[in-house]
Amino acid sequence: MPVHTLSPGAPSAPALPCRLRTRVPGYLLRGPADGGARKPSAVERLEADKAKYVKSLHVANTRQEPVQPLLSKQPLFSPETRRTVLTPSRRALPGPCRRPQLDLDILSSLIDLCDSPVSPAEASRTPGRAEGAGRPPPATPPRPPPSTSAVRRVDVRPLPASPARPCPSPGPAAASSPARPPGLQRSKSDLSERFSRAAADLERFFNFCGLDPEEARGLGVAHLARASSDIVSLAGPSAGPGSSEGGCSRRSSVTVEERARERVPYGVSVVERNARVIKWLYGLRQARESPAAEG
């Protein structure tokens, strides 16, 4: 039977004018079937037509229930655990706690130590208190225990620092002796030998550069000294062993700054030295040719 068939006694559709009846679709003009009865679902329609496609009589007579998800029926907590969680815990009320009584003797001794002024003898012994920190405090004479209301707050005040002692003034000997440099100290003999060796090497190089000793002696000491005066002056204060010894003794009594100030800087470049050597050789040549021109 079609669903849209009207049942007898169903209320008819309301009367509409002709011009509206021709324009409205027919399915809108029909009233609800079975007086507004619910439309069967697809499962119900299949259940009604089961005999058409099921051959077994047992299956046709049984009704299939909708599938429901499996729910875990086991409780999350055991009854004992739930009972212990839900029931309020009854703890035994602790008895009246007894506070430790204050030792009034120790408290009074602390008050006396903080209130008493520090004597100068104790202030002078203040640096040594760190060594005897583990020693017990000196015993104080017993006093009658004061009442609880007489106990006042202990204010710990820092001890006054001991006055700084003035540094002893250095003696006249210490003031007169100059400060020695902390570096390596060389002996006088080592320094004099070093300066004399450097002076001898420098003098040998400039006096006999390109000349044999016999040829230099043949030219004469006066010509040699006159020609090489501007070159030998490079030796500075270390021109001979005697002067180096005197300079060494003088340098040993001055500080590092004065020694650096007195040191002669050798700022002569290589070009200037070569020019002086060429000039010196040229002077030797002129000194050699002058006796030949006079003879």
Swiss-Prot record:
Highest taxon of the source?
Eukaryota
Tissues and organs where the protein is expressed, per its UniProt entry: Detected in thyroid, lymph node, trachea, adrenal gland, bone marrow, spleen, thymus, prostate, and peripheral blood leukocyte. Detected at lower levels in stomach, testis and spinal cord.
GO process terms (BP)? mitotic spindle organization
Q: Does the keyword Cytoplasm apply?
A: yes
Annotated region Disordered: the residues are 117-192, 236-256
Stated induction or repression of this protein's expression: Up-regulated in stimulated lymphocytes.
Protein name, UniProt field: Protein FAM110A
Native organism = Homo sapiens (Human)
Question: Which lineage do the record's taxonomy fields give for this organism?
Answer: Eukaryota, Metazoa, Chordata, Craniata, Vertebrata
